[in-house]
From Swiss-Prot:
Species for this entry: Methanospirillum hungatei JF-1 (strain ATCC 27890 / DSM 864 / NBRC 100397 / JF-1)
Pathway where it operates: Amino-acid biosynthesis; L-arginine biosynthesis; L-arginine from L-ornithine and carbamoyl phosphate: step 3/3
GN (gene name): argH
Subcellular location: Cytoplasm
One annotated GO biological process: L-arginine biosynthetic process
This protein's name: Argininosuccinate lyase
InterPro entries: Arg_succ_lyase_C (IPR029419), Argininosuccinate_lyase (IPR009049), Fumarase/histidase_N (IPR024083), Fumarate_lyase_fam (IPR000362), Fumarate_lyase_N (IPR022761), L-Aspartase-like (IPR008948)
Regions annotated as coiled coil: none
Reactions catalysed, as given in the entry: 2-(N(omega)-L-arginino)succinate = fumarate + L-arginine
Disulphide bridges: none
Top-level taxon of the source organism: Archaea
Pfam families per the UniProt record, alphabetical: ASL_C2, Lyase_1
GO terms of molecular function: argininosuccinate lyase activity
Length: 493
């Protein structure tokens, strides 16, 4: 007969290996084993405080739980004969303390609310790690950008040369994208950090549990009030996967550019050797493998997100076992994201950007012709669309000298630019990269002064975000410290 204390009375007969394999969540539960011990401790502190469990029984149980907390969940608890880690831990506790003691830990609780609570604790911790990593990445981007205020390069649309920008301006675009990823994750954390504990199977319990108390001990911001929603909903997992999918999409876009920029025919950047590999046959190769794998990670997490949301979409209230199959997708999707962020930060920080090559390309491909058209509008009062036609015709004809522009002006405006006072000097000045950059000084533009202002503003925003994380981690740490203090008091250690 199975050793699982949950199963042995109601159900008889040994399960086949196939059934055990299908129903077991043990591998995925490795992610929440330590969280389960914390949940057990908080629940037991509350049961003792509410005089539901006698202090002597609580003392015996808490000693074992503290041992698990300090030494780690024993390998025996992960035996595949248990359906999940919760049954494994309870079985071991019952064996060590006896049925009269160990059997009291689960009073007023179901695995439904227990699992949901553990999932939220672990997801919360992962999100906080990701948020910290994002602040490091953003700090790197701001630091590298500060070194490249005047490093000119072409900006692209459709992967074609478009207008001159600076490397600093380009990097600030990504920093701003990653700041929104931070905002999304931090906002999601508000909905993740809610306690289902005390909801039991679906209809709460007749025991006088103190749900807000256990929520405080575990560092939650509040309880999930409706007990059915608390155990049946996994939108916190779906939302976290969605946020991380968008984050990795932004990482993928950046990596795509680094891959292109590091190619022999572009040569905008030289990636540090640590982030590259060579070929097993071609000795000259330096392949941007880390960037390529990071680019591919979007596909992995998108698959996890789609799988998770599809599992949930047809489930009636309240708990259904289908939800167990969501957990591996959650962990597969989100557990590697902090590493991905850190790798990108390291890759950017250690990269060498080729200022000369960027400058060579900055004025190629007609990148400054927009400024020429704008000059005709600003200084000579030509309608913009007409100026656009005049310059576009000159580009098509292959020359941007005054003679060629005059021909276009006569065709589209009925008079030459020369007759309006336009000189070759006006044209040459408008076509210079420095002019194109210097006039684009609106907030968020690539002009050096505008970039310096943006850097200062972004640093302020980053400092605020770092403070947000620090405050949240301090709050959670204080709660867990109080939990351990009360647990040790009960265990009289």
């Amino acid at each position: 007969m199975t050793r699982d204390v949950v199963r042995k009375a109601r159900l008889s007969g040994e399960r086949t290996e196939d059934i055990e394999s299908l129903l077991s969540s043990m591998e995925a539960d490795r992610n929440i084993a330590s969280s389960d011990v914390l949940v057990d401790m908080a629940h037991l502190v509350m049961l003792t405080r509410q005089q539901i469990v006698h202090e002597d029984h609580a003392k015996t149980l808490m000693k074992e739980l503290l041992c698990m907390y300090e030494s780690g969940v024993p390998a025996e608890a992960f035996d595949p004969s248990y359906e999940d880690i919760h049954a494994g831990i309870e079985t071991i506790l019952t064996r060590k303390t006896g049925g009269d003691v160990g059997g009291r830990l689960h009073i007023g609780r179901s695995r439904n609310d227990e699992v949901a609570t553990c999932l939220r604790i672990r997801t919360r911790d992962i999100i906080l790690d990701q948020l910290e990593a994002l602040t490091r990445l953003r700090s790197v981007l701001l630091s590298v950008a500060a070194d490249h205020i005047t490093t000119v390069m072409p900006g692209f649309t459709h992967l074609q040369h478009a207008q001159p920008v600076t490397l600093a301006h380009h990097l600030l675009a990504y920093e701003q994208m990653f700041s929104r990823d931070f905002d999304r994750l931090f906002d999601a954390l508000r909905r993740v950090n809610c306690s289902p504990l005390g909801s039991a199977a679906l209809a709460s319990t007749g025991y006088p549990l103190d749900r807000p108390f256990t929520a405080d001990l575990l560092g939650f911001d509040r309880i999930l009030v409706n007990s059915m929603d608390a155990v049946a909903s996994r939108d916190f997992a779906e939302e976290t996967l969605a946020c991380d999918t968008m984050l990795l999409t932004n990482i993928s876009r950046f990596c795509e550019e680094l891959i292109i920029w590091s190619s022999a025919f572009v040569q905008f950047v030289n990636l540090d050797d640590r982030y590259c590999s060579t070929s097993s046959i071609m000795p000259q190769k330096k392949n941007p493998d880390v960037a390529e794998i990071l680019r591919s990670r979007t596909g992995t997490i998108l698959g996890s997100f789609v799988s998770a949301i599809t599992i949930v979409k047809g489930l009636p209230m309240a708990y259904n076992r289908d939800l167990q199959d969501l957990n591996p997708h959650l962990w597969r999707g989100i557990t590697g994201v902090r590493r991905d962020i850190d790798l990108l930060a390291g890759m950017v920080e250690s990269a060498t950007f080729n200022r000369e090559r960027m400058a060579e390309e900055a004025g190629r491909g007609g990148t400054t012709t927009t400024e020429l058209a704008d000059t005709l509008v600003r200084e000579f009062n030509i309608p913009f669309r007409t100026a656009h036609h005049i310059v576009g015709k000159a580009v098509k004809d292959g020359s941007l000298d005054l003679v060629t522009l005059d021909r276009g002006a006569e065709e589209f405006y009925g008079k030459t630019l020369s007759s309006l006072g336009v000189t070759q000097k006006n044209i040459d000045s408008a076509l210079s990269v420095s002019t194109s950059l210097s006039v684009r000084k609106l907030p968020g533009g690539p002009a050096p002064d505008a970039v310096l202002d943006a850097l200062a503003e972004r640093r302020k925003e980053l400092e605020k975000d770092i403070e947000l994380i620090c405050d949240k981690k301090t709050q959670i740490s204080a709660s867990l410290h109080e939990l351990l203090t009360q647990a040790r008091r009960i265990a009289q250690l």
